[in-house]
Amino acid sequence: TQSRSSAASDVYKRQELYGEIRNFFSLPLETKRSYEIPGIGGQRGYVSFGTEHAKGRKEGDLKEFWHFGQYVSEDSKYASEYPENVQVKELPKFNAVGKEAYQMLEKTGVYVLRALALRLGLDEFYFDNYAKDGNSILRPIHYPPITSEPANAIRAAAHGDINLITLLMGAQGKGLQVQNHEGEWIDAIAESDELVINVGDMLSRHTNNKLKSTIHQVVNPPRELWGTSRYSVPFFMHPVSDMPLNCLENCIDAENPKQFEDITSGEYLYERLVDLGLIKKSVSYTHLRAHETKAN
């Protein structure tokens, strides 16, 4: 009975989350854009339709999204790095529901990383201190109805995620595809009570490509479904900014020599935000960090 009660509670929380997300994206564009914060690379608040594009592409993805970020205590050494979460005054439950989902998925992500650590021959708790107060992001995404034939853009072009791992709840609408080892695209459909877990580029880099990044895309629906929205809520699990992403020694050998230069997760994130079009290269990594400190 307790497990049934817990399952029912999870269903309610998931429905409540998607309800709040729909409510937000249904707000007038002018209202949503009032929550678009300049100068922080889209790390908190609203990011408008077509702003983000995949690495190596110029066409903006056919989506708009929101970012919930880390909730740190004031005495955390990372507190000054993170912009504050943006409060939506029109929706009194939106931020609380988002925070609860963020913290539940973060907790789940820690357990996934522990399992991966054991698989990699590391201490089970290797990732724990890097994940605590990490720069993780919960991103509710809205792919609006398609109103005309897109020239080259799709809902989300093929890409790998930046972070360590991504936890993705069953989306409201199909379209997610992942690329298998043969280079073929296959549909990735999670049920409402399941999670899709992707390996991100940071973990791929840290393991010297022993764990390969999950390349995925969100394709446009068939014409008869153009009038439908798609909603998705990925949780991007990032480490703290000073985590070294140097290739692990036990992932380097004669058959798999070191493939990546040493870099911290913060520096790597900056490079990728430039690639995505979320910040301009004229904004240096140190300037961005200074702005984040000021924003807090």
Where are these regions (language model features)?
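Conserved double-stranded beta-helix
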Residues: 37-43, 71-74, 97-177, 219-225
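Non-heme Fe(II)-dependent double-stranded beta-helix
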Residues: 6-103
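Catalytic core of Fe(II)/2-oxoglutarate
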Residues: 6-7, 127, 153, 168-263
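C-terminal helix/juxtamembrane-tail motif
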Residues: 266-289
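Structured loops at beta-to-helix junctions and adjacent beta-edge loops in soluble globular domains
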Residues: 49, 63-71, 141-143, 170, ...
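Conserved small/polar residues in nucleotide/adenosyl-binding loops
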Residues: 1-2, 8-15, 286-293
